Amino acid sequence: MRASSFLIVVVFLIAGTLVLEAAVTGVPVKGQDTVKGRVPFNGQDPVKGQVSVKGQDKVKAQEPVKGPVSTKPGSCPIILIRCAMLNPPNRCLKDTDCPGIKKCCEGSCGMACFVPQ
């Protein structure tokens, strides 16, 4: 083995040892600093740099937004005849798709708007 080859092997061993030590001790690699910018003062939100309002919970979730009621009163009529289609077309998907008091019910061939019983 020539001296230059031996020197290259030694350099790689030293570099590998240094990388291994940095990984074990948790030393951050240059350019990967965990904290950038100013350190927030007491009571300041570290994310946006704003002071939190007293009595306001940062983590509390908001109530879900309630939309219009999707079901109308009444029950769907009983349908005695069924079509032979495998996937019949639907004229509606929910009660709000139907005008007035009509409900979206299973018809003889797909969903359709019916006057409830």
UniProtKB/Swiss-Prot annotation:
<comment type="function">
    <text>Neutrophil and pancreatic elastase-specific inhibitor of skin. It may prevent elastase-mediated tissue proteolysis. Has been shown to inhibit the alpha-4-beta-2/CHRNA2-CHRNB2 nicotinic acetylcholine receptor and to produce a weak inhibition on Kv11.1/KCNH2/ERG1 and on the transient receptor potential cation channel subfamily V member 1 (TRPV1).</text>
</comment>
<dbReference type="GO" id="GO:0019731">
    <property type="term" value="P:antibacterial humoral response"/>
</dbReference>
<dbReference type="GO" id="GO:0005576">
    <property type="term" value="C:extracellular region"/>
</dbReference>
<feature type="propeptide">
    <location>
        <begin position="23"/>
        <end position="60"/>
    </location>
</feature>
<dbReference type="GO" id="GO:0007620">
    <property type="term" value="P:copulation"/>
</dbReference>
<dbReference type="InterPro" id="IPR008197">
    <property type="entry name" value="WAP_dom"/>
</dbReference>
<keyword id="KW-0646">Protease inhibitor</keyword>
<keyword id="KW-1015">Disulfide bond</keyword>
<keyword id="KW-0964">Secreted</keyword>
<feature type="repeat" description="SVP-1 clotting 2">
    <location>
        <begin position="55"/>
        <end position="72"/>
    </location>
</feature>
<dbReference type="GO" id="GO:0005615">
    <property type="term" value="C:extracellular space"/>
</dbReference>
<dbReference type="InterPro" id="IPR036645">
    <property type="entry name" value="Elafin-like_sf"/>
</dbReference>
<keyword id="KW-0732">Signal</keyword>
<dbReference type="InterPro" id="IPR050514">
    <property type="entry name" value="WAP_four-disulfide_core"/>
</dbReference>
<dbReference type="GO" id="GO:0005829">
    <property type="term" value="C:cytosol"/>
</dbReference>
<dbReference type="GO" id="GO:0001533">
    <property type="term" value="C:cornified envelope"/>
</dbReference>
<dbReference type="GO" id="GO:0030280">
    <property type="term" value="F:structural constituent of skin epidermis"/>
</dbReference>
<feature type="region of interest" description="2 X tandem repeats of SVP-1 like motif">
    <location>
        <begin position="29"/>
        <end position="72"/>
    </location>
</feature>
<dbReference type="GO" id="GO:0004867">
    <property type="term" value="F:serine-type endopeptidase inhibitor activity"/>
</dbReference>
<dbReference type="InterPro" id="IPR002098">
    <property type="entry name" value="SVP_I"/>
</dbReference>
<dbReference type="GO" id="GO:0045087">
    <property type="term" value="P:innate immune response"/>
</dbReference>
<feature type="disulfide bond">
    <location>
        <begin position="92"/>
        <end position="104"/>
    </location>
</feature>
<dbReference type="InterPro" id="IPR019541">
    <property type="entry name" value="Trappin_transglut-bd_rpt"/>
</dbReference>
<feature type="disulfide bond">
    <location>
        <begin position="98"/>
        <end position="113"/>
    </location>
</feature>
<feature type="disulfide bond">
    <location>
        <begin position="76"/>
        <end position="105"/>
    </location>
</feature>
<feature type="repeat" description="SVP-1 clotting 1">
    <location>
        <begin position="29"/>
        <end position="54"/>
    </location>
</feature>
<feature type="signal peptide">
    <location>
        <begin position="1"/>
        <end position="22"/>
    </location>
</feature>
<feature type="disulfide bond">
    <location>
        <begin position="83"/>
        <end position="109"/>
    </location>
</feature>
<keyword id="KW-0677">Repeat</keyword>
<dbReference type="GO" id="GO:0031012">
    <property type="term" value="C:extracellular matrix"/>
</dbReference>
<feature type="domain" description="WAP">
    <location>
        <begin position="69"/>
        <end position="117"/>
    </location>
</feature>
<keyword id="KW-0722">Serine protease inhibitor</keyword>
<protein>
    <recommendedName>
        <fullName>Elafin</fullName>
    </recommendedName>
</protein>
<dbReference type="Pfam" id="PF10511">
    <property type="entry name" value="Cementoin"/>
</dbReference>
<dbReference type="Pfam" id="PF00095">
    <property type="entry name" value="WAP"/>
</dbReference>
<dbReference type="GO" id="GO:0018149">
    <property type="term" value="P:peptide cross-linking"/>
</dbReference>
<dbReference type="GO" id="GO:0004866">
    <property type="term" value="F:endopeptidase inhibitor activity"/>
</dbReference>
